[in-house]
Amino acid sequence: LLDNFLAEKFIKKAGESTEYNINIMDEKGVIIASKDAERIGNFHEVAYWIIHGDEEIIDVPDGGKYLGVKPGVMLPIEHRGKRTGAIGVTGEPDEVRDIAKVMKFAIETMYEFES
């Protein structure tokens, strides 16, 4: 399982490289780490969908339609073939999609080496 320590460590390092907010959600769709500390502990509806569904990426142009969601891009975090969480980058989807893909790759790589 994705743990808070790893998620917080990732946010601290990766957050330095982008102006955009990054959120990491656990398997229940709860934000466990974020550049925006006020969001930690909140349920994220789209994260829950992507963790328990089969979508590879979800663009959210209007976050207000969903519980705990702001505009951005959401991707699943996968570890050894299982979805264990989600990572999202807040912003206009066309602007943050590539950043979100890099963040997904980075956290999955970190997760693999640290677990």
Report residues per predicted region.
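Hydrophobic, helix-rich cores of sensory/ligand-binding and other regulatory modules
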Residues: 2-115
